[in-house]
UniProtKB/Swiss-Prot annotation:
Similarity annotation: Belongs to the peptidase S1 family. Kallikrein subfamily.
Recorded GO MF terms: serine-type endopeptidase activity
Propeptide intervals in chain numbering: 19-24
Originating organism: Mus musculus
Entry function: Glandular kallikreins cleave Met-Lys and Arg-Ser bonds in kininogen to release Lys-bradykinin.
The protein, known as: Kallikrein 1-related peptidase b5
Length: 261
């Protein structure tokens, strides 16, 4: 599982500790500049770790398995190495993983049929509110169930090399379809539950992967998921990726934000 590879690499003190995997957004393209203004880059110290989504000026949503001990985020970034005056840097004052996410599964182990990565989401409260601009904008949570067969867009800075984890310079986008959960049940040994979405290209070649975790899955123009987990190597035929199904967590997200305002 590729998110476990990333987590273990970070916990060992460096990205270069990751074993060989093919890990990037496959079959994607450079996102049009500033076309994903809700996209967040989540760092551990000064190393890029995961994607995220800006929900409002004070809160970022990401994956629970992106939990670390020292967060900082960038908003409004397109390219990691270009000077982008419109981008905003923020520290994080509080991290709140979903209480039902099983953090013990992040320990190194052989995947088992009983492994359940449900509830893979976490809220980050910014130490200073984001300035809402043309290139930094929040996105709304979904208000209804996503439709099977919807065209979805995922984005992130997943690795561009198959051996050493190295984020893409430019924000990458990829399009694929929302699939029945049964397709993912057949493809994965780990549990696929009703709080997950199954999405990808059954022909292979289009996928999210290590480094894309926590980033948005937008189907028919609506934020419906965040990248959670998938196969390693990524982009395999008949093995779609798994995304946290946000409609199932609207109440928890809103209640948590209200209690920690």
């Amino acid at each position: 599982m590729w998110f476990l590879i990333l987590f273990l690499a970070l916990s060992l003190g460096g990205i270069d500790a990751a074993p060989p995997v093919q890990s990037r957004i496959f079959g994607g393209f450079n996102c049009e500049k500033n076309s994903q203004p809700w996209q967040v880059a989540v760092y551990r110290f000064t190393k890029y770790q995961c994607g995220g989504v800006l929900l409002n000026a004070n809160w970022v949503l990401t994956a629970a398995h992106c939990h670390n001990d020292k967060y900082q985020v960038w908003l409004g970034k397109n390219n990691f190495f270009e000077d982008e005056p419109s981008a905003q840097h923020r520290l994080v004052s509080k991290a709140i993983p979903h209480p039902d996410f099983n953090m013990s599964l992040l320990n190194e182990h052989t995947p088992q049929p009983e492994d359940d990565y449900s509830n893979d989401l976490m809220l980050l409260r910014l130490k200073k509110p984001a300035d809402i601009t043309d290139v930094v904008k929040p996105i709304d949570l979904p208000t209804e169930e996503p439709k099977l067969g919807s065209t979805c867009l995922a984005s992130g800075w997943g690795s561009i090399t198959p051996v050493i984890y190295e984020p893409a310079d430019d924000l990458q986008c990829v399009n694929f379809k929302l699939l029945p959960n049964e397709d993912c049940v057949k493809a994965h040994i780990e549990k696929v539950t009703d709080v997950m979405l199954c999405a990808g290209d059954m022909d292979g070649g289009k996928d999210t992967c290590m480094g894309d975790s926590g980033g948005p899955l937008i189907c028919d123009g609506v934020l419906h998921g965040i990248t959670s987990w998938g196969p390693s190597p990524c982009g395999k035929p008949n093995v779609p990726g798994i995304y946290t199904k946000l409609i199932k967590f609207n109440s928890w997200i809103k209640d948590t934000i209200a209690k920690n305002a």
